[in-house]
């Protein structure tokens, strides 16, 4: 507890250890962690950053890919931003719960959600079957009050019909110890949450801590851009774009498009 480790490689002419520590404390404070086991003022920060391998730099200096790998982008017509509805609703719920911390001081920073839909057809969600929301809360608050308020917040935020929806709010009944104090965190461990919520394949590479030379991030962003434009232009109801790269090579080693249930080389 009360520990942050930052490790990795950098390529920069300037490296300020004190500035990095300041950024870490500010980010933790901005999130809102001020609990006994994880407080921005009391963190022990272990900085293990070091210079990038010159062998890797050889490949990226001329805009080549920083590594090999597969990246996927996905888009569909389920929502106005061409994201799957389940992950879209999860994001809306959690953004609203975080906003409500201003009105309910007992809501603490660690929250997560899961939405289950039923479908009448591909790309046609029928209804919201279940909503799970686990909300970290202060110790002095009654669990039934937590469940009541969180369900009210969700119902106010989600405009879809929730008449037959089953709510699972803090299913264990208590969620006081949260964040890195309760569960060791590592950036990049939740790659499905960071993308499409299980609606699309994933190459395995995380986004966190990477700049544009790392195609795990920039390649995935480009694949999403391509998929979104295929769908938004009316050429498909859903589209998956797969790219692959080789380290040091500028152009993709392969491009694959799968839309509306079939391979679409024409796209």
Question: PLM features: residue spans?
Answer:
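Acidic, glycine-rich active-site loops and adjacent beta-strand->loop/helix elements
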Residues: 10, 49-52, 119, 173, ...
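Glycine-rich anion/phosphate-binding loop at the beta-strand->alpha-helix junction
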Residues: 140-231
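Beta-strand segments within the central parallel beta-sheet cores of soluble alpha/beta enzyme folds
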Residues: 40-47, 166-170, 236-246, 252-258
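Glycine-rich, mobile lid/loop segments that gate access to catalytic sites or pores
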Residues: 2-4, 14, 22, 27-176
């Amino acid at each position: 507890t009360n520990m942050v480790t930052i490790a990795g490689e950098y390529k920069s002419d300037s490296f300020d250890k004190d500035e990095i520590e300041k950024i870490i404390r500010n980010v933790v404070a901005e999130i809102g962690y001020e609990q006994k086991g994880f407080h921005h003022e009391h963190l022990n920060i272990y900085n293990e950053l070091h210079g990038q391998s010159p062998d890797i730099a050889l490949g990226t200096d001329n805009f080549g890919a920083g590594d090999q790998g597969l990246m996927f982008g996905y888009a569909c017509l389920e929502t106005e931003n061409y994201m799957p509805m389940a992950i879209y609703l999860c994001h809306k719920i959690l953004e609203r719960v975080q906003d409500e911390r201003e009105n309910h001081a007992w809501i603490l920073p660690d929250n997560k959600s899961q939405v289950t839909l039923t479908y009448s057809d591909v790309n046609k969600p029928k209804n919201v079957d279940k909503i799970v929301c686990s909300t970290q809360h202060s110790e002095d608050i009654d669990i039934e009050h937590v469940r009541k308020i969180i369900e009210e917040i969700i119902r106010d935020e989600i405009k879809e019909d929730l008449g037959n929806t089953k709510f699972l709010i803090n299913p264990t009944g208590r969620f006081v110890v949260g964040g890195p104090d309760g569960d060791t965190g590592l950036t990049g461990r939740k790659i499905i949450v960071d993308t499409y919520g299980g609606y699309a394949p994933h190459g395995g590479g995380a986004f966190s801590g990477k700049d544009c030379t790392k195609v795990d991030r920039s390649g995935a962003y480009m694949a999403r851009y391509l998929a979104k434009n295929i769908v938004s232009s009316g050429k498909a109801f859903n589209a998956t774009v797969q790219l692959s790269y080789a380290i040091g090579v500028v152009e993709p080693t392969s491009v694959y498009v799968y839309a509306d249930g079939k391979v679409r080389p024409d796209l």
